[in-house]
Amino acid sequence: MSVGFIGAGQLAYALARGFTAAGILSAHKIIASSPEMNLPTVSALRKMGVNLTRSNKETVKHSDVLFLAVKPHIIPFILDEIGADVQAGHIVVSCAAGVTISSVEKKLMAFQPAPKVIRCMTNTPVVVQEGATVYATGTHALVEDGQLLEQLMSSVGFCTEVEEDLIDAVTGLSGSGPAYAFMALDALADGGVKMGLPRRLAIQLGAQALLGAAKMLLDSEQHPCQLKDNVCSPGGATIHALHFLESGGFRSLLINAVEASCIRTRELQSMADQEKISPAALKKTLLDRVKLESPTVSTLTPSSPGKLLTRSLALGGKKD
């Protein structure tokens, strides 16, 4: 089995690193395409021994499972470009927030009568094999196709199948969730520094507290509130701290953050449906930095195939 990534940004790097670390794929079985070869993530993939190319078509040609790992509003143009190269045996996995199975199928069916499409939402902790992934299968995807993706994603964390209408909410919760955790950790570390702790120690303590709390919850059958109550002694420091968080609307802020991410996910789908980004903008900018200043509706013509750039590790060479 070979895996390809259209896009060589943070998600592609995280998944490639996770797959190789888990031992489910060798680096030479992975290919990623990017119009820009100087990105830090591209350099990291190159060091891992992943095959790299500027041609999306080349990536399709060398893949069995194809991950669309680009921004949502770029997806329609990518599908126009690679549609003729997608074969009946390909499993096309959309990782873009808000991009529906039907929208991908509609594009591909102009070239292929029964494209096998799976919609997936994962997160960056896959890089350390602690990701959270859900997926939904499309009209023509077989049960075995879903099982193959689940096997891949389970090697880098938790993975389960859901109904597609739940995926936007998953995006707001676990898709964006690591960013919430990092922001909370940054604030906790600031609090530690304010009270006299060295920065490095404050970060380590905060990270371990979050890691330990998450593991306690996952390993138990208790509700989070029960575990929270177990930390609070009557009249103690923790209950006073929680009162302060409650008075600042801590819970409401998190609930609103999940909702805001979910709503934005649906807005991104609307943008993708309307194809608001011009091919000119697509060519001028990096995949993760498309300019939206002067959007126009037009059709992207397939680009000419680029040269496949490969890197092979010498015998006895170091692995990243």
UniProtKB/Swiss-Prot annotation:
Residues involved in NADP(+) binding: 6-11, 34, 56, 69-72, 95-97
Annotated EC: 1.5.1.2
Phosphoserine modification, residue list: 304
Single GO term (MF): pyrroline-5-carboxylate reductase activity
One BP annotation, GO: proline biosynthetic process
Gene3D superfamilies given in the database record: NAD(P)-binding Rossmann-like Domain, ProC C-terminal domain-like
Pathway(s) of this molecule: Amino-acid biosynthesis; L-proline biosynthesis; L-proline from L-glutamate 5-semialdehyde: step 1/1
Keywords assigned: Acetylation, Amino-acid biosynthesis, Cytoplasm, Mitochondrion, NADP, Oxidoreductase, Phosphoprotein, Proline biosynthesis
Top enzyme class: oxidoreductase
Location relative to the cell: Cytoplasm; Mitochondrion
Annotated positions of the N-acetylserine modification: 2
Disulphide linkage map: none
Location of region: Disordered: 296-320
Ranges of biased composition (kind: Low complexity): 296-305
Reactions that this protein is recorded to catalyse: L-proline + NADP(+) = (S)-1-pyrroline-5-carboxylate + NADPH + 2 H(+); L-proline + NAD(+) = (S)-1-pyrroline-5-carboxylate + NADH + 2 H(+)
UniProt-annotated binding residues for L-proline: 164, 237-238
Family: Belongs to the pyrroline-5-carboxylate reductase family.
Protein name per its UniProtKB record: Pyrroline-5-carboxylate reductase 2
Source organism: Pongo abelii
